[in-house]
Amino acid sequence: METAWSNILNYKNVSDRYILTEKDKKGAFTRQYFEVYEARLKELKPRILENAEREIGKGKFTHSQLSDAKQDEEIFVVGVIVKRIAARPSILKSLLNEDKVAYDDYEEDAEEDEVKRYAGSIEDRIELESDKQTVRLEGNISMDECATGCCVGVLGKLGKEGVFHVNRLVWPSVKVPKKVAVDGTIAFVSGLDLTGDLEDDRLTISGLEFMADWMNVQVGNENQCPPIDRLVVIGPLVETKSNGCDVQSVVRTLTLSRAEKHSSTASLITVDKIINSIAEKPLVNTVDVTPGVGDPCSSMWPLPPIHRVCLPRCGMSDKKVNLVTNPYEFEVNGLRVMTMSGENVSELLRTSLKWTGADAIENIIKWQHVAPNCPDTLDAFPVAERDPLIMDITPHVIICGNQPHAEFRHIPIDGSNCLVVCLPKFSKTRVACFLNLSDLSLKWQNFDHQF
């Protein structure tokens, strides 16, 4: 008989900053973009200057406002990056040119495994906004090392034509937690994308059932699964005919038919049953459920937890099912883990022809911001007094869901390192990831058993 797994890990949810306060919400929808970027720059500027003193040398650079820049004088300016990409589609142009905003071009069966990327152009350029002024950047900077919304310090000179020639870039300082030794296993799945139709969901449901059984079999073979301290289910849990990342997706979401809205309700019932059944397994200690864009919660980053009324069975077992934010950060015995549903990374990949998912996350660590493309190409709640998506501490592990391919990378940071993992959609691959906390090794397991 199976015996329940007793978890000895000290768990702590450290996602408080992703929860919006009443102060954040007050007057939110009267704010402009510049207030969001202003708050971001205000928080990151001291860390950029701190890093500049370490990398360039204290007293070896002149920190100046862009408005005070003189031609051919080397100065250090801190500001926000803006990437001007000619091929980037405009929703305003689409509204003017198409009555239905490309809704007729939506393909029901279109493959979404690969990220659609913007084609490069000689018209593409990089600008820096600082002190309510904008200047074009050239020199020691490329389109593949920055993104719109990044805060950076640039050391260089203002040229004759009003172009700033960059000699050196300085990013915010990085705070890395101490190394810790932890024994245990955490499992991760992402992108269930359930539709509520049993035929459409057949492979996903059978894969989840297979995974639940595999995690609870106590047999002595090489495929034996260790006791699972936590299972983290990364959204989206339900399929919405949309990925929320472009004009067609927005229109598709706004024009769902009655039948499609009904299917969303049915899919929630399916999700509730499956997650609750997994949580009841004796060898699974706790299930964390984090939402994605399209799930029944706000689609503006950071996403709040799904309300328990949407998952009533899970709500009744609150000790084993934990409804959390997106992004979601937690610690187990001091080991810090961050998960995110991946819309931020998918949007970043659109702006580069070279990046992989791991490249994008490595840049996120360098920029010290989870989603610099908020609120430019990714919906974000307009918080003005603070930026909840700034990385105060770089986690030991970052798991990014809903990516085209499985991928991982160890990124060295000041004597420590961060493990970044790109996790594909379970609905398409039936692949789950098992993280060994003692050595941060990964086990990829496929639960696709088609006959």
From Swiss-Prot:
Gene Ontology molecular function: DNA binding; DNA-directed DNA polymerase activity
Keyword terms, alphabetized: DNA replication, DNA-directed DNA polymerase, Nucleotidyltransferase, Nucleus, Transferase
Highest taxon above the source species: Eukaryota
BP GO terms, sorted: DNA strand elongation involved in DNA replication
Primary localisation category: nucleus
Subcellular localization(s) per the UniProt record: Nucleus
Summary of subunit composition and partner proteins: Heterodimer with subunits of 125 kDa and 50 kDa.
Role description: The function of the small subunit is not yet clear.
Protein name in the entry: Probable DNA polymerase delta small subunit
